[in-house]
């Protein structure tokens, strides 16, 4: 999965979002071990400290768990993952609807366009 970073907000925030998407899409399965901070930083083309900051935020959100001797793993709490999936989906729907309203595109017009 490519790491396209937009630079329109803090890099670590973009990394958090991309890793969340990898988790909710199943790219990283519940209970699976993540690559090391260094490996992911190299893959993403960012400083390891930036990746570490993103991992810390993901740990605070409950999506990642640190295992002292075996690195970081995706939580096995599928309810937590599902909740994050629903939150992200709702945010994307809200942003889309806001964009459509900004260009005066109504629900009726959208429905008519589809048929």
Question: Where are the predicted features?
Answer:
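N-terminal intrinsically disordered/low-complexity leader segments
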Residues: 1-8
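Glycine-centered, phosphate/nucleic-acid-interacting loop/turn motifs that mediate DNA/RNA or nucleotide
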Residues: 26, 62
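Short, Lys/Arg-rich nucleic-acid/phosphate-binding segment
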Residues: 34, 66-73
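Conserved segment of winged-helix/HTH DNA-binding domains
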Residues: 78-103
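A short alpha-helical element within helix-turn-helix/winged-helix DNA-binding domains
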Residues: 33-44
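Conserved small/polar residues in nucleotide/adenosyl-binding loops
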Residues: 106-115
